[in-house]
């Protein structure tokens, strides 16, 4: 898949997660979502979208199965320190806190979406310039 298409695909994941989280029933009085199932789904979709974008800009050797988060952090550290910081925060927020724990806090979920967009934006910025032939 071309790099531009991977970035667009990553953004599509974020849009899908936005639709999913709407089903989590937000309680404005408590400032929480009421259904963790949709939080978990949205968090996992967000993180998957980030992985699509990261695969576009990071050179990671593929072995058996999916590369570990450590490989992504190592590759990002060599390429761009700001991307590394976003990956560390994003992994914790989207994959662990949202995706596994299903944290219902609106602030946590909003932070997950912000981090996903930050990672994808940074990957887009780091994409090599298209070669015009």
Can you annotate each of these PLM segments?
Residues 1-133:
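Terminal alpha-helical segments
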């Amino acid at each position: 898949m071309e790099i531009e298409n991977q970035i667009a695909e990553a953004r599509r994941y974020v849009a899908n997660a936005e639709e999913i989280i709407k089903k989590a029933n937000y309680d404005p009085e408590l400032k929480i979502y009421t259904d963790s199932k949709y939080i978990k789904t949205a968090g996992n979709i967000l993180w998957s979208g980030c992985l699509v974008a990261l695969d576009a800009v990071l050179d990671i050797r593929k072995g058996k199965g999916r590369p570990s988060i450590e490989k992504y952090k190592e590759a990002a550290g060599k390429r761009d320190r700001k991307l590394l910081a976003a990956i560390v925060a994003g992994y914790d927020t989207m994959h662990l806190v949202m995706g596994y724990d299903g944290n219902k806090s609106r602030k946590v979920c909003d932070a997950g979406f912000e981090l996903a967009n930050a990672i994808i934006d940074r990957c887009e910025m780091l994409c090599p310039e298209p070669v015009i032939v």
